[in-house]
Amino acid sequence: MLLTGTSRRKAENSMADQKKIAIFGGGTGLSVLLRGLKQHPVDITAIVTVADDGGSSGRLRDELKIPPPGDIRNVLAALSDVEPLVEDLFQHRFSKGGDLIGHSLGNLILAAMTNITGDFFHAVTEMSKVLNVRGRVLPAANTSVVLHAEMDDGQIISGESTIPSYGKRIKRVFLTPEKIEPVPETIDVIRGADLILLGPGSLYTSILPNLLVPKIREEILNAPAKKFIFAM
């Protein structure tokens, strides 16, 4: 349908009037929240952790030296506006086929798009267009990070997928590299947000990895937006 000049201005004004929500997290909790939020007239930006190192994501980040695509894939699917079959295809996980076992097709597509566009950020941007995403999806950084946890017994456990299974109380968590730079667009999103949501998800493995990026943490602390955290 073609919009007249007046209709187009009304649509643009309607979008400008929407509350801007910046949501930080990873894992399945974030995707569940986004599926509900996209049904409402709000301007959503999801900023997704790049600390995942398990399963298909971990294999691709190790073999191809790219940020882990799994959490991003789930968020893209949650915010997509496509036929159900297309989303099912994007989320399909191979159960046989040798080296393909365990891989999600969406992860492989994001890896391929990273090769085509030259970096992970632009891959996510292009896939957002392909999937007609409602809102915006940003990786917290354009490179992978490793999450570490210092336990009460003094042990340092490395890897987001390994930390929960250690079974000891966590004293602190930190990233390597420590001086990782966020995607610049993330800073603009934080500064322009009316509401900042952290989570839902695991405090140590889904929420804190984003806050351990120094500039993201500083910008959230200084942002005038209302802030809420949903930690498990």
What residue spans do the PLM features occupy?
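Structural motif
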Residues: A22-I23, L197-G199, F228-F230
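Catalytic-core regions built around general acid/base machinery
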Residues: V189, L212-A223
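Electropositive, gly/pro-rich neighborhoods at or near active sites that engage anionic ligands
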Residues: A51-K168
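Glycine/threonine-rich flexible loop motifs
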Residues: G201-V213
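Short, Lys/Arg-enriched N-terminal segments with co-localized hydrophobic residues
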Residues: G5-S14
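A short helix->loop->beta-strand "cap" motif at the edges of active sites that frequently abuts
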Residues: V42, A223-F228
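Gly/lys/ser-thr-rich phosphate-binding loops in alpha/beta enzymes
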Residues: N13-I66
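Active-site gating loop/helix substructures
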Residues: T143-P200
